[in-house]
Structures are given as C-alpha cells and as structure tokens.
Amino acid sequence: MSRLGNRAADWADDEEFDDPSALPAQQVTTNKDGTKTVVSYRFNDEGKKVKVTRRIKTTVVREHVNPQVAERRSWAKFGLEKGHAAGPSFDTTSVGENIIFRPSVNWRAQAAEAEKAGPEKGSIKDQLKDKKVKCRICSGEHFTARCPFKDTMAPVDETAAAGAEPGAEDVPAAGGLGAGTSSYVPPHLRKGAAAGGERMAGKYEKDDLATLRVTNVSELAEESELRDLFERFGRVTRVFLARDRETQRAKGFAFISFADRTDAARACEKMDGFGYRHLILRVEFAKRAT
C-alpha cells in the first residue's frame, strides 16, 4: 500500500507541471545568417495563451561618444539585473528611438499668449523660429552683450560708419538744433559727436592683448581640458569653447585668454600643431576687426 501511495503522489506531482496558467520560458535561437529568432508566450485579452515569434537582425553602428559615457555603459549591472549580460535585456527593456525633449518652464503661459496673439503674430513667430543668434564679436551662438570677449575684441561692424557717403555731412542730424522732428537723439549720435569718444575696446585699446584663437578642436573637447593644456604656460584668465545649441558639442574653435602676452606668445608657439584628441590644433592670436 505504501508503494501505491507513493506512486499516486508522484502522479499528482507530474500533473502540477501541466499547469495551464504557467508560461513556457523564452527561447532564443541563433540562425546561420546571423539573425536571432526569439519565441515567447503571453496571454491575450481573452485569457488565451499566444505564441509570439520575433526575428531580430543585429546591425553594428559605429558612433563616436564621450569616453566617460562609454565607460559607464561597461559597468557591471546591479540589483535585479545583477549577473546579466551587458546591454539592454529583451525582458525588461524596450529599445526605441532616442528623442531629445527640452521642456520650457513657462510653456503654458507661452501657449496662452500665442493663442491671444492671433494668426498675424503667430506667423511672425513661425518665420523667426529657424533664426539663430549670432555674436558679432566671436560669431558664437549667443547674444553680443553676453560675449566673454566683448572687452578684448571689437565687433565686426565697428567701423561700419567709416564708409558713409560723403554727402551725408550736409544733411542736418535729427534731434539737433533746427530739426523738424520731435524724436529724441542721444548726444553721442548727433552731428559732430561721432568722433567725441571711443568705446572701451576700440582702436585706442592697449596692444598687449593676450587672447589666442584655437581651431580644429575636437567635438568631444571640454573647457577644463583646454584650460589644463594652456595653463602650463601661464595664468589663464578665461576659456571660451563654442558649442552647438542643439547637440551641445564643440563647434571646432575656442578662445584662450592669458594674463600676460608673453605667456600667450609662448603658448601659441608650443601648442600650434599640437595633437589633441586625434586632431592637430591650430593656434594663433585672435585678430580684432579693423
């Protein structure tokens, strides 16, 4: 009787493996053409067991990324993913397109103003949405008033007034004595006051400027790395690395300001032709607009 009882118990244990609520394990098969066939099971909305077969083709895409980001991707997994292979897992991760989303802080207020403005102002906004800000001093994507070199370099159109027509002096300036208009004109813009003074970074500025222009800079360059490279020759007062507004990568040029022009000349001589991140740097003194 004991043997019959044990057999009955064993038969009951065997029946437990045929539980209809249990799903078979996922099967991954590697094909000869390099693709993978993944077979998995799931329950549909009606509670029926459904077999899902996916054929995956792996494509290797070579991409240049920041070395620090690549190092973090090679870290060992932890937590519930501890011990799993590197890369995303099909069970827990759904790989999709990388979408860059930059929300605005006051986007609700801006949307309300756009609706109140009407179609006329909305069309102007659509016309200006593709416009980019360009600095008149270093040609960077920022406002000229925020340029870090506004005190050391002159803007490109500084001498635009020098090419005025010869007969322009005979026309009375607006806002002066006897003018027929009531619009106010500042004294420094009136007739005869153009030569009364010069801007701080004008042509009378001292000639011992110590700003270097570095070109052929890698997209992965950082301001701290450039500072470390040039501080070997003297005290660096400012480092400006032009970046793209969309990708935040370097645009290929930078400005390095030294406290002493002698240090800048030595750095220009040593760093011109220096290899940095598989590129050859081109270093020269920044030229002011004439």
From Swiss-Prot:
Residues 1-34 are annotated as: Disordered. RNA-binding component of the eukaryotic translation initiation factor 3 (eIF-3) complex, which is involved in protein synthesis of a specialized repertoire of mRNAs and, together with other initiation factors, stimulates binding of mRNA and methionyl-tRNAi to the 40S ribosome. The eIF-3 complex specifically targets and initiates translation of a subset of mRNAs involved in cell proliferation. This subunit can bind 18S rRNA. GO terms for molecular function: RNA binding; translation initiation factor activity. PANTHER family: EUKARYOTIC TRANSLATION INITIATION FACTOR 3 SUBUNIT G. SMART domains: RRM. Its main location: cytoplasm. PROSITE patterns: RRM. Component of the eukaryotic translation initiation factor 3 (eIF-3) complex. GO terms for biological process: formation of cytoplasmic translation initiation complex; translation reinitiation; translational termination. One of its GO terms (cellular component) is multi-eIF complex. It comes from the Eukaryota. It is found in: Cytoplasm. This is Eukaryotic translation initiation factor 3 subunit G. It comes from Neosartorya fischeri (strain ATCC 1020 / DSM 3700 / CBS 544.65 / FGSC A1164 / JCM 1740 / NRRL 181 / WB 181). Keywords: Cytoplasm, Initiation factor, Protein biosynthesis, RNA-binding. Belongs to the eIF-3 subunit G family. Residues 210-288 form the RRM domain. The lineage of its organism: Eukaryota, Fungi, Dikarya, Ascomycota, Pezizomycotina.
